[in-house]
């Protein structure tokens, strides 16, 4: 990623190349330091929810949907196929190492991966009543 560290109007344009993750962490750090009092506030970093595209990740049949799921995943080692444990670990480690302030990571990715019974496509207001055939296959 190329970042312009000067004004467009400045004759001496300074362009820096860096990884997008580094740019994100740098920008977040600057904002937190400028906008928050670490003695009065806490910083939380929330990961993303899994995509929920593969019912097979929750023990369901391929091609089916989340309709009528009533129990969460009980296996604490469960991890969806489209989520990376390594990436979640790296996020926490990177934030710990790079930030000049305490950052608490809310691992929504892992937390929501257990909840096949709470898939939002089942609980939204439908145009017509849900049944096994009409519930969204992809969520």
Curated annotation (Swiss-Prot):
GO terms for molecular function: O-acetyltransferase activity. It comes from the Eukaryota. InterPro entries: TBL (IPR029962), TBL_C (IPR026057). Belongs to the PC-esterase family. TBL subfamily. This is Putative truncated protein trichome birefringence-like 46. It comes from Arabidopsis thaliana.
């Amino acid at each position: 990623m190329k970042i312009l560290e000067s004004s467009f109007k400045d004759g001496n344009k300074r362009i820096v190349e860096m990884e997008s993750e580094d740019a994100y962490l740098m920008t977040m750090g600057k904002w937190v330091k400028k906008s928050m009092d670490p003695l009065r506030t806490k910083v939380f970093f929330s990961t993303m929810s899994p995509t929920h595209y593969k019912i097979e990740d929750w023990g369901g049949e391929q091609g089916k949907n989340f309709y009528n799921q009533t129990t969460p995943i009980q296996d604490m080692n469960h991890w969806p196929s489209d989520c990376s444990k390594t990436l979640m670990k790296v996020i926490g480690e990177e934030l710990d190492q790079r930030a000049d302030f305490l950052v608490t990571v809310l691992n929504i990715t892992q937390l929501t991966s257990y909840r096949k019974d709470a898939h939002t496509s089942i609980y939204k207001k439908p145009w017509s009543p849900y049944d096994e055939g009409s519930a969204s296959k992809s969520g």
